[in-house]
Amino acid sequence: TCEKATFNIIGKSGEDFSYLPQIERSDSILLSQFTLKEVIRQTIFSIADNFTNKILTGELFEINGNLLKVVSSDGLRISLRRIELKNTYPDKKVIVPGKTLNEISKILSGDADKDVNLFFTDKHILFEFDNTTVVSRLIEGEYLKIDNILSADYETKVKINKREFLSCIDLSLIHISE
């Protein structure tokens, strides 16, 4: 028992903290949690981790009709993932901070039967899924023009079986280590 003990708890008024911005919940982009989690997993590794170029610390989310293109780059590597959406949406380009995507990836269940709604304003993105709402500021600026870097007119194009190729790489790594 505490009987005569007294405690002083120091706190701040709720008015000292900023409120979440009001984001109109119309025209949402709908994705499955599994798809969003996979897209983040497949692109997050090539985000720049320094602040010399703030734009490269985020990922470009570009919507053209029923196609979502997610791009990240650290200046040396480029990750590009295209997803065909179920519906058609107005064209939009935003740069989502990598830290936000990393946190989203941790709390998504990855269930293919559950959806995520993405809402955009000029300065914010809102992720809404299950009973969770995440709001983040967008990175302002123009992302790299990836289409200029990755042209489609290659002199040589090779199509390979991914599993066989990875198996050969694993085998060569065994020989190298010996």
Feature-to-residue mapping (PLM):
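Structural preference for solvent-exposed beta-strand-turn elements
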Residues: T1-S177
